[in-house]
């Protein structure tokens, strides 16, 4: 062996060792299974997906949404609306996550199985686009809150102290910076996100407890407010609207729970990680905001704590919570857009890897965040709480009613048919019902439209048209030309 060969051999050995060490440190998994089921031997179990979900749903904006709900309803009605919305999300995400675990499918693949390889283009594009916008908004919000405390004029949080002068005190600059920083976490995949999620859970939980203590002592002493009994102090809203707002906080990602639930190893784990997300983590964020408004009788993005320790604790909470929400949104979006590139040619290996797609989506989201175009949460909540359940309802109807007894092979075979027309009719009918409710029955949550279309209309048409029988897709439902009949 020559000296050059020896050097090359040592280099390869060192390079392999460095890769192994970096994977252990950053928990990077080369295979994210973006376009095929996660096999049982690659499943991560409970803790890592649970930490990703917990960090994801520790969203700072949910504190303000909880505050808004309480301002519109007062206590205790505001607490009831928040709880019912979170209970709905738990059941909704749990049903989708259960089937994602069973078949090892992410959200895009579940959509393809339900709508067909061409039929799923529009719903997948809409959801992936919405969650990309949510990624951009969370990064923008992190920037605007920092500017409102330390910079110049913010969009939502008032005027800052001026510690950050000139361009350093503008929302657009920091929105772009935060979008890149937060987005880079998602580029390294589910395992790195789990590591970040652990840090977020420890940090935000500790600071949340501190917030509740501070609110119940410092703020309550100043205002004399009662957290358990208070009159509405903001824009009045109906109880149904309060529930809808609670659901709207995470109904898009609850619809996409398959991206996380597919990594679990049992049904209990699949339901468990969704329980961590909604009755616990997201509920805590909403509760803090509601608790503050019930005591203080006003809305404030810093919840009366901007002067405590120079605002450092509240700033840490919003950085960490918005950061983990950003990486979860980007991960969801990238799973969707990666699958959209496989339309018509699922067997062909494309040059765009999942990681490259994630970087592209991150760059697009960064541009949107830095442009300051997403500066109002209300339209987003209304849009996502109406659109997402239309698709989630179809997933529930498909995997729990139409194809509940099919095998994984049959379910995947059905994903290769072009269009599942009963599902398309179901989503269109759900859209019509939701539009009718928004226009003529505003006291009812439009979420019901998606559930009616997906869980009632779609199964009825599928059975009537011969696409399904006795909880199984027929040859017609799978695609006769592919089933060999």
Report the location of each language-model feature.
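Hydrophobic alpha-helical segments and their helix-loop junctions in multi-pass secondary transporters
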Residues: 139, 143-148, 152, 203-229, ...
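Loop-to-transmembrane helix boundary motifs in multi-pass membrane proteins
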Residues: 167-176, 339-374, 415-431
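Helix-loop-helix connectors at the membrane interface of multi-pass transporters/channels
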Residues: 142-170, 329-360, 402
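Membrane-interface loop-to-helix entry segments
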Residues: 173-215, 271-278, 381-393, 450-455
